[in-house]
UniProtKB/Swiss-Prot annotation:
Gene3D superfamilies: 2.60.120.200. Changing C136S: Loss of homodimerization. GO terms for biological process: apoptotic process; phospholipid metabolic process. This is Galactoside-binding soluble lectin 13. The keyword Cytoplasm applies. SMART domains: Gal-bind_lectin, GLECT. InterPro entries: ConA-like_dom_sf, Galectin-like, Galectin_CRD. It is found in: Cytoplasm; Nucleus matrix. It comes from Homo sapiens (Human).
Length: 139
C-alpha cells in the first residue's frame, strides 16, 4: 500500500458525529522517541488557532492541548499509549457533543473536552515520524 506525504493536510468540516480516522506506522524504533502529531486547525493556515493537538511520543506518553490567539493553554497528558513498536495503528478521533474521544486500535485512551467548537475546525494536519497510509473524515 502506498504512503501519503507527511505532513499531510486535509480540508475538513467537523460536527458532532464526525470521526477522523488515521492509519499509519511509526518509521523509527520507539527507542529513538518517534512522534505522531495531529492538529485540528481553525483555518487553512498553520498560524491559525488549533482547536485540538494530539501528540504521541511513541512508547512514552501522549500530550493534548489547544492554541488560541497564538497562546498554548494548559496541556493534558496520559501515559497510556497502546501503540506497538513497528506495527500499523488505527487512530480514531470521534467528535462528540462535549469532547473528542480518542481511540487507538479500538481502545479508548482519552477524552479531550472541547474548548473551541468542532465546527470551527477547517483543516486536519498529520505530521512527524510516521509512514501514513490513510486519513479520512466520516460525517
Amino acid at each position: 500500500m502506498s504512503s501519503l506525504p507527511v505532513p499531510y493536510k486535509l480540508p475538513v468540516s467537523l460536527s458532532v458525529g464526525s470521526c477522523v480516522i488515521i492509519k499509519g506506522t511509526p518509521i523509527h524504533s520507539f527507542i529513538n522517541d518517534p512522534q505522531l502529531q495531529v492538529d485540528f486547525y481553525t483555518d487553512m493556515d498553520e498560524d491559525s488557532d488549533i482547536a485540538f493537538r494530539f501528540r504521541v511520543h511513541f512508547g512514552n506518553h501522549v500530550v493534548m492541548n489547544r492554541r488560541e490567539f497564538g497562546i498554548w493553554m494548559l496541556e493534558e497528558t496520559t501515559d497510556y499509549v497502546p501503540f506497538e513498536d513497528g506495527k500499523q495503528f488505527e487512530l480514531c478521533i470521534y467528535v462528540h457533543y462535549n469532547e473528542y474521544e480518542i481511540k487507538v486500535n479500538g481502545i479508548r485512551i482519552y477524552g479531550f473536552v472541547h474548548r473551541i467548537p468542532p465546527s470551527f475546525v477547517k483543516m486536519v494536519q498529520v505530521s512527524r515520524d510516521i509512514s501514513l497510509t490513510s486519513v479520512c473524515v466520516c460525517n
